[in-house]
Protein backbone atom coordinates (compact mmCIF):
# COMPACT_ATOMS: atom_id res chain seq x y z
CA UNK A 1 0.00 0.00 0.00
CA UNK A 2 1.25 3.43 -0.87
CA UNK A 3 1.02 5.40 2.34
CA UNK A 4 1.53 8.92 3.59
CA UNK A 5 2.40 7.48 7.01
CA UNK A 6 5.78 5.82 6.52
CA UNK A 7 7.17 3.10 8.72
CA UNK A 8 9.66 4.48 11.21
CA UNK A 9 11.11 3.14 14.45
CA UNK A 10 14.12 4.05 16.55
CA UNK A 11 16.83 1.47 17.23
CA UNK A 12 15.30 0.29 20.51
CA UNK A 13 11.88 -0.28 18.92
CA UNK A 14 13.38 -2.18 16.00
CA UNK A 15 15.27 -4.44 18.40
CA UNK A 16 12.12 -5.13 20.39
CA UNK A 17 10.19 -5.85 17.19
CA UNK A 18 12.80 -8.43 16.21
CA UNK A 19 11.94 -10.54 19.27
CA UNK A 20 8.23 -9.75 19.74
CA UNK A 21 5.75 -10.54 16.99
CA UNK A 22 3.02 -8.64 18.84
CA UNK A 23 5.12 -5.49 18.99
CA UNK A 24 6.28 -5.92 15.38
CA UNK A 25 2.65 -5.68 14.24
CA UNK A 26 2.63 -2.15 15.66
CA UNK A 27 5.88 -1.24 13.87
CA UNK A 28 5.52 -2.67 10.37
CA UNK A 29 2.71 -2.88 7.83
CA UNK A 30 1.99 -6.35 6.43
CA UNK A 31 2.77 -6.72 2.74
CA UNK A 32 -0.92 -7.13 2.02
CA UNK A 33 -1.90 -4.00 3.95
CA UNK A 34 -4.63 -1.83 2.46
CA UNK A 35 -7.19 0.65 3.69
CA UNK A 36 -10.39 -0.83 5.09
CA UNK A 37 -13.63 -0.59 3.15
CA UNK A 38 -16.00 -0.03 6.06
CA UNK A 39 -17.94 3.06 4.97
CA UNK A 40 -19.14 3.83 8.51
CA UNK A 41 -15.54 4.13 9.64
CA UNK A 42 -13.93 5.50 6.49
CA UNK A 43 -16.29 8.50 6.43
CA UNK A 44 -14.30 9.98 9.32
CA UNK A 45 -11.19 10.10 7.12
CA UNK A 46 -7.85 11.10 8.58
CA UNK A 47 -9.06 13.64 11.15
CA UNK A 48 -12.05 12.09 12.97
CA UNK A 49 -11.90 14.46 15.93
CA UNK A 50 -11.61 17.68 13.94
CA UNK A 51 -8.18 18.57 15.26
CA UNK A 52 -7.49 20.58 12.11
CA UNK A 53 -10.87 22.30 12.24
CA UNK A 54 -13.44 22.75 15.02
CA UNK A 55 -11.33 21.41 17.90
CA UNK A 56 -8.51 23.86 17.15
CA UNK A 57 -9.00 26.90 19.38
CA UNK A 58 -5.68 28.66 18.86
CA UNK A 59 -2.50 27.63 17.09
CA UNK A 60 -1.47 24.21 18.41
CA UNK A 61 -4.19 24.01 21.09
CA UNK A 62 -7.13 21.59 20.86
CA UNK A 63 -10.14 21.58 23.15
CA UNK A 64 -12.87 18.93 23.02
CA UNK A 65 -13.80 18.90 26.72
CA UNK A 66 -14.56 21.82 29.03
CA UNK A 67 -11.97 21.16 31.75
CA UNK A 68 -8.95 20.20 29.66
CA UNK A 69 -6.93 21.17 26.62
CA UNK A 70 -4.35 19.42 24.47
CA UNK A 71 -1.18 21.12 23.26
CA UNK A 72 0.61 19.86 20.15
CA UNK A 73 4.25 20.00 21.23
CA UNK A 74 5.85 17.93 18.47
CA UNK A 75 5.08 16.21 15.18
CA UNK A 76 7.64 13.43 15.70
CA UNK A 77 7.59 10.14 17.59
CA UNK A 78 10.16 7.47 18.40
CA UNK A 79 8.02 5.12 16.32
CA UNK A 80 5.19 5.60 13.84
CA UNK A 81 2.68 3.24 15.45
CA UNK A 82 0.64 1.60 12.71
CA UNK A 83 -2.60 2.13 14.65
CA UNK A 84 -1.98 5.85 15.22
CA UNK A 85 -5.04 8.10 15.42
CA UNK A 86 -3.09 11.02 13.97
CA UNK A 87 -1.49 9.03 11.13
CA UNK A 88 -3.24 11.25 8.57
CA UNK A 89 -2.03 14.48 10.17
CA UNK A 90 1.68 13.93 9.54
CA UNK A 91 3.05 17.23 8.27
CA UNK A 92 -0.34 18.94 8.62
CA UNK A 93 -0.81 19.40 12.36
CA UNK A 94 -0.21 22.77 13.98
CA UNK A 95 2.73 22.39 16.36
CA UNK A 96 3.64 24.95 19.02
CA UNK A 97 7.26 25.88 18.37
CA UNK A 98 7.77 29.57 19.18
CA UNK A 99 7.57 31.55 22.40
CA UNK A 100 4.70 33.63 21.04
CA UNK A 101 2.73 30.51 20.09
CA UNK A 102 3.18 29.06 23.57
CA UNK A 103 2.25 32.38 25.18
CA UNK A 104 -0.97 32.42 23.15
CA UNK A 105 -1.85 28.94 24.42
CA UNK A 106 -1.15 29.96 28.02
CA UNK A 107 -3.29 33.08 27.58
CA UNK A 108 -6.13 30.96 26.20
CA UNK A 109 -6.03 28.69 29.26
CA UNK A 110 -5.67 31.57 31.72
CA UNK A 111 -8.81 33.17 30.29
CA UNK A 112 -10.78 29.98 30.99
CA UNK A 113 -10.58 29.17 34.71
CA UNK A 114 -12.61 25.99 34.20
CA UNK A 115 -9.58 24.42 32.50
CA UNK A 116 -7.66 22.43 35.12
CA UNK A 117 -5.85 19.79 33.06
CA UNK A 118 -3.33 20.29 30.23
CA UNK A 119 -2.20 17.43 27.98
CA UNK A 120 1.21 17.89 26.37
CA UNK A 121 0.96 15.68 23.34
CA UNK A 122 1.94 15.42 19.70
CA UNK A 123 3.73 13.50 18.26
CA UNK A 124 5.67 12.69 21.38
CA UNK A 125 6.83 15.53 23.61
CA UNK A 126 9.90 13.55 24.69
CA UNK A 127 11.33 13.76 21.18
CA UNK A 128 12.19 17.30 22.31
CA UNK A 129 15.19 18.06 24.49
CA UNK A 130 14.82 18.41 28.26
CA UNK A 131 14.91 22.21 28.09
CA UNK A 132 12.06 22.31 25.57
CA UNK A 133 10.03 19.74 27.50
CA UNK A 134 10.30 21.82 30.66
CA UNK A 135 9.43 25.00 28.78
CA UNK A 136 6.00 23.51 28.13
CA UNK A 137 5.62 21.93 31.57
CA UNK A 138 6.63 25.03 33.50
CA UNK A 139 4.48 27.39 31.42
CA UNK A 140 1.28 25.58 32.41
CA UNK A 141 2.29 24.34 35.87
CA UNK A 142 2.82 28.00 36.84
CA UNK A 143 -0.91 28.67 36.41
CA UNK A 144 -2.70 28.35 39.76
CA UNK A 145 -5.83 26.95 38.10
CA UNK A 146 -3.92 24.03 36.59
CA UNK A 147 -3.97 20.94 38.78
CA UNK A 148 -2.62 18.39 36.29
CA UNK A 149 -0.02 18.62 33.53
CA UNK A 150 -0.04 15.40 31.55
CA UNK A 151 3.13 14.44 29.71
CA UNK A 152 1.77 12.16 26.98
CA UNK A 153 4.53 9.90 25.73
CA UNK A 154 5.08 6.37 24.51
CA UNK A 155 8.82 6.70 25.14
CA UNK A 156 8.63 4.36 28.14
CA UNK A 157 7.72 1.64 25.65
CA UNK A 158 9.41 2.74 22.43
CA UNK A 159 12.63 4.40 23.68
CA UNK A 160 12.87 4.03 27.47
CA UNK A 161 16.44 5.30 27.62
CA UNK A 162 15.01 8.77 26.96
CA UNK A 163 13.72 8.86 30.54
CA UNK A 164 16.76 9.91 32.56
CA UNK A 165 17.18 10.69 36.25
CA UNK A 166 17.71 14.35 35.33
CA UNK A 167 14.48 14.52 33.37
CA UNK A 168 12.52 12.73 36.09
CA UNK A 169 13.83 15.17 38.69
CA UNK A 170 12.86 18.17 36.57
CA UNK A 171 9.38 16.81 35.88
CA UNK A 172 8.77 16.21 39.59
CA UNK A 173 9.44 19.77 40.74
CA UNK A 174 5.97 21.27 40.25
CA UNK A 175 4.11 18.35 41.81
CA UNK A 176 1.55 18.61 39.00
CA UNK A 177 2.97 16.27 36.38
CA UNK A 178 1.39 12.95 35.47
CA UNK A 179 2.84 10.75 32.75
CA UNK A 180 0.43 9.07 30.34
CA UNK A 181 1.94 6.26 28.33
CA UNK A 182 0.92 3.31 26.15
CA UNK A 183 1.82 -0.36 26.40
CA UNK A 184 -0.14 -2.88 24.36
CA UNK A 185 1.44 -6.25 25.11
CA UNK A 186 3.40 -7.76 27.98
CA UNK A 187 6.52 -8.09 25.80
CA UNK A 188 6.84 -4.31 25.93
CA UNK A 189 7.42 -4.33 29.70
CA UNK A 190 11.14 -4.96 29.34
CA UNK A 191 13.72 -4.33 32.04
CA UNK A 192 14.50 -1.00 30.36
CA UNK A 193 10.83 0.00 30.29
CA UNK A 194 10.38 -0.91 33.96
CA UNK A 195 13.47 1.09 34.88
CA UNK A 196 12.16 4.14 33.02
CA UNK A 197 8.84 3.91 34.84
CA UNK A 198 10.58 3.49 38.19
CA UNK A 199 12.63 6.66 37.67
CA UNK A 200 9.41 8.64 37.36
CA UNK A 201 7.39 6.84 40.02
CA UNK A 202 10.19 7.01 42.57
CA UNK A 203 10.12 10.80 42.12
CA UNK A 204 6.43 10.86 42.95
CA UNK A 205 5.19 11.15 39.36
CA UNK A 206 2.13 8.97 38.68
CA UNK A 207 2.41 6.86 35.54
CA UNK A 208 -0.80 5.69 33.87
CA UNK A 209 -1.32 3.54 30.80
CA UNK A 210 -3.83 3.91 27.99
CA UNK A 211 -3.68 0.72 25.96
CA UNK A 212 -5.37 0.11 22.62
CA UNK A 213 -7.23 -3.11 21.87
CA UNK A 214 -5.53 -4.43 18.73
CA UNK A 215 -6.31 -7.50 16.70
CA UNK A 216 -3.35 -9.86 16.69
CA UNK A 217 -1.65 -8.02 19.55
CA UNK A 218 -3.79 -8.22 22.70
CA UNK A 219 -7.24 -9.35 21.55
CA UNK A 220 -7.63 -12.34 23.85
CA UNK A 221 -8.32 -12.54 27.56
CA UNK A 222 -5.03 -14.33 28.38
CA UNK A 223 -2.96 -11.75 26.47
CA UNK A 224 -4.81 -8.81 28.01
CA UNK A 225 -4.59 -10.23 31.53
CA UNK A 226 -0.87 -10.84 31.08
CA UNK A 227 -0.42 -7.21 29.99
CA UNK A 228 -2.42 -5.83 32.91
CA UNK A 229 -0.46 -7.95 35.40
CA UNK A 230 2.82 -6.75 33.90
CA UNK A 231 1.74 -3.12 34.15
CA UNK A 232 0.69 -3.49 37.77
CA UNK A 233 3.93 -5.21 38.71
CA UNK A 234 5.77 -2.22 37.22
CA UNK A 235 3.57 0.13 39.31
CA UNK A 236 1.99 1.54 36.15
CA UNK A 237 -1.75 2.10 36.56
CA UNK A 238 -3.78 0.68 33.67
CA UNK A 239 -6.76 3.01 33.41
CA UNK A 240 -8.06 2.81 29.82
CA UNK A 241 -8.20 0.22 27.08
CA UNK A 242 -9.39 1.98 23.94
CA UNK A 243 -11.17 0.53 20.97
CA UNK A 244 -9.42 1.58 17.75
CA UNK A 245 -10.37 5.11 16.77
CA UNK A 246 -12.53 5.69 13.67
CA UNK A 247 -9.67 6.73 11.41
CA UNK A 248 -8.87 5.45 7.94
CA UNK A 249 -6.06 2.96 7.44
CA UNK A 250 -6.20 0.87 10.61
CA UNK A 251 -9.02 -1.53 9.82
CA UNK A 252 -6.86 -4.63 10.25
CA UNK A 253 -6.50 -3.83 13.97
CA UNK A 254 -10.20 -3.49 14.79
CA UNK A 255 -11.73 -5.84 17.35
CA UNK A 256 -15.52 -6.40 17.48
CA UNK A 257 -17.25 -4.78 20.44
CA UNK A 258 -18.70 -8.08 21.66
CA UNK A 259 -15.23 -9.61 21.79
CA UNK A 260 -13.94 -6.56 23.65
CA UNK A 261 -16.72 -6.94 26.22
CA UNK A 262 -15.84 -10.58 26.73
CA UNK A 263 -12.17 -9.70 27.29
CA UNK A 264 -13.19 -7.01 29.78
CA UNK A 265 -15.47 -9.44 31.63
CA UNK A 266 -12.82 -12.12 31.91
CA UNK A 267 -10.22 -9.61 33.07
CA UNK A 268 -12.60 -8.41 35.79
CA UNK A 269 -13.07 -11.99 36.95
CA UNK A 270 -9.31 -12.54 37.16
CA UNK A 271 -7.80 -9.33 38.53
CA UNK A 272 -8.21 -6.93 41.42
CA UNK A 273 -9.41 -3.37 40.99
CA UNK A 274 -5.96 -1.78 40.83
CA UNK A 275 -5.19 -3.83 37.72
CA UNK A 276 -8.49 -3.19 35.92
CA UNK A 277 -8.79 -0.45 33.30
CA UNK A 278 -12.00 0.84 31.77
CA UNK A 279 -12.70 -0.40 28.25
CA UNK A 280 -13.90 2.60 26.25
CA UNK A 281 -14.36 4.09 22.80
CA UNK A 282 -13.49 7.66 21.86
CA UNK A 283 -16.41 8.71 19.68
CA UNK A 284 -16.32 11.94 17.65
CA UNK A 285 -18.75 14.44 19.14
CA UNK A 286 -19.24 12.57 22.42
CA UNK A 287 -18.86 14.49 25.68
CA UNK A 288 -16.84 11.75 27.33
CA UNK A 289 -14.99 8.53 26.68
CA UNK A 290 -17.81 6.04 26.10
CA UNK A 291 -17.80 2.73 28.03
CA UNK A 292 -18.26 -0.21 25.70
Model segments located where?
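Canonical Radical SAM [4Fe-4S] cluster-binding loop centered on the CxxxCxxC motif
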Residues: 63-99, 151
Amino acid sequence: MKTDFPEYACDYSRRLASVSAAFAKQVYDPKSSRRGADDEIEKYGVDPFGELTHASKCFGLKQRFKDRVLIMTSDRCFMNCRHCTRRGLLGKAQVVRTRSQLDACVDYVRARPEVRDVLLSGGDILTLGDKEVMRFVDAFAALEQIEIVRVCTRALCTNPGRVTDRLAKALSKSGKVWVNTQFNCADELTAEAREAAAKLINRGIPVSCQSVLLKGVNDSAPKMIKLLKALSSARIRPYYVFMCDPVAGIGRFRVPVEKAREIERRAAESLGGLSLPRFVADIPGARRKTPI
